Amino acid sequence: MTRISVHEVISTVLDPDTFSSWDTPPVQPDYGPQYAAQLARATQRSSADEAVVTGGALIGGYRVAVIVGDFDFLAGSLGAAASERITLAFERATAEGLPVLASPMSGGTRMQEGTPAFLHMIKISQAVLAHRAAGLPYLVYLRDPTTGGALASWGSLGHLTIAQPGALVGLLGPRVREIMLGEPLPEGVQRSESLARKGVIDGVVPLRELRTTAVKALRVLTSPQEPVGERFDAEGIATDRAPWDSVQATRNPERPRLHHLLHHAAEVFIPLRGTGTGESDGTITVGLVRFPGLSCVLIGQDRRPRRDASLSPAALRVAQRGFHLAEELDLPLVTVIDSPGPELTTEAEHGGLAGEIARTVAALATVRVPVVSTILGEGNGVAALALLPADRTVCAENGWVAPLPPEGASAIIHRTADRAADMAAAHRIRAVDLLEMGAVNEIVPERPDAAEEPAEFCRRLIASATAQLAELVAMKTEERLRIRHDRYRSMT
């Protein structure tokens, strides 16, 4: 594994000649002449005065604070001086309203300084959370290796966390763990690719692509909100369409899915993988998105065959991560509903699926940022309900919402699935029915069917959602929340 130096990070990622150091000469604690000699040798070997470099810079023209670990200085270990430097950098970034790009590379706490150095993890974490509480973006790029106290503080608190390919990332380095416990971890457990698959980090990106990723993220997170969109009235929407025809239309394999929506309508999309705490489920997509004039957090279901797309408890916890992220970054939320239903397995029941649905609905219904839910296709039961609460809801002309798939409702009422079409009609599942009952604010036309005009339809659906958000972002928060509450309270 080739280790990435501080110089390589600065020269590859930052705009040329824009880095300005914030560092002052470190004040080192007195742990005797042996430690002083170690520090002197580390400085001589690395040409650095501590294990971290901080400063201000531009990335793609965006002003940022930069914090980069230096493994060449005592294995990037964090003592009192390095921890103070990190803390001061976060505090300055917060005071100046700057996003932070941090790139840890560290063996952990500096053992020469013992417990006092270990306890500095607390103040670093406090400074990071104060920065996040100010609504400022925090991007993390983990380099090989990142372990111990660095990973367990500033390395794990980013809004977006990605890592170098093949990087060793873990709480305890493999050599120390094997000495302590007598056996190693299985091969690959502490590698960045494994952590991405498990939902601990958001992805794996080589250094040469980090600048592009950072610029995209900064564009989403710092660009002004000037949404543009298009409104559609109900005139021309067929009211005599059989509900079962809409069900069949949404199950057409050629019908656009979430990834088509993003491809045709998003200017930037940065996926966020998993919960960040070790769970990952691909049935829910969460990401930072830039639509024309509007940045948002998008949370959506990407319709696939039932066996691949049923909603699990972990998927709902992934969605909840998106809610929290939107609130912290003060970004609107757009949800996309298109699901065959919840996971119906022993694992889902034991995993608390019903409780996660309740918590997801409650969280989305009360989140303080503007929310628009979009019904792209199938709205099957509680899987749809989980992403439905919103200030405004737009629905594709063939979109629908039902407490169960019509076949399931038919099985309950008629003890056969053969009456599914009758149940679809009886349950008032169509977009026009949802509009009439107040569950939908606008129907987006399909001309004549989304499967026949995927690009145009996707752009219309997002134009409708962003037009709704243009009105919502202009409203005072408390007024908007009151209207949202009253909307569902008064629904008949």
For the regions a language model picked out, list residue spans one by one.
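A structural preference for short, pocket-lining loop segments at secondary-structure junctions
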Residues: A57-D70, R85-R110, V289-R303, L316-L344
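Intrinsically disordered, low-complexity segments enriched in small/flexible residues
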Residues: M1-I59, R63, R211-C296, G300-D308, ...
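Conserved catalytic cores of soluble enzyme domains
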Residues: S106-P227, I337-T466, A470, A474
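Conserved acidic
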Residues: L74, L78, P206, L311, ...
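Flexible beta-alpha connector loops of hexameric P-loop NTPases
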Residues: L74-A81, E113-P116, R306-A314, T346-A354
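A structural preference for long, well-packed, hydrophobic secondary-structure segments
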Residues: L129, R303-L333, G351, I357-V369, ...
